């Protein structure tokens, strides 16, 4: 199944989809400092370097053999983040969500996934979020929106993220977010679980000698 990756960064989200069996023939990233990292991580993916606002279907289509099954991406979070500008859709970076939707409408894939920071669900952004949901609906997608925490899904990290997941309406898919495997506190994976095996090999900093 072919996936288009937008706002790809170094390709972390892409890696998850590749491990799930998807192919990502083409991706886009704006930041030149990340290009080489992405290419090393995903040598089989063609990276379109540059501003997503300037990219059209004609730029992407030549790298796809067959139909596009899905579009994934993490539009910039700074304008939504509690540690960022808090301007949401009023910030130019927040408006890049519109370009994600524009490309979605051009390809009409079976599904999409868009991820962002938990601050997007702050009350101050409610009108903007409802507008985004309406745009997805107008584009022909049934959308599910929720916030999940990585610690509930087997990760030793407190990391809350908002996910928009949509399926084309003609497919009549009723998506439900899966229950986390470690939602129960007794099953949580901690940093201790991850690095405990290093106790016999790590050298205490006080015992290290300069080279």
Annotated model-derived regions:
Residues 27-28:
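The conserved SAM/SAH-binding core of class I Rossmann-like methyltransferase domains
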Residues 36-65:
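S-adenosyl-L-methionine
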Residues 16-23, 41:
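A short, Lys/Arg-enriched amphipathic alpha-helix followed by its capping loop at the start of a domain
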Residues 31-32:
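Conserved SAM/SAH-binding beta-strand->alpha-helix loop
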Residues 58-67, 77-211:
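Class I S-adenosyl-L-methionine
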Residues 1-3:
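Extreme N-terminal starter segment of soluble prokaryotic enzymes
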Residues 6-10:
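Class I SAM-dependent methyltransferase "Motif I" SAM/SAH-binding loop
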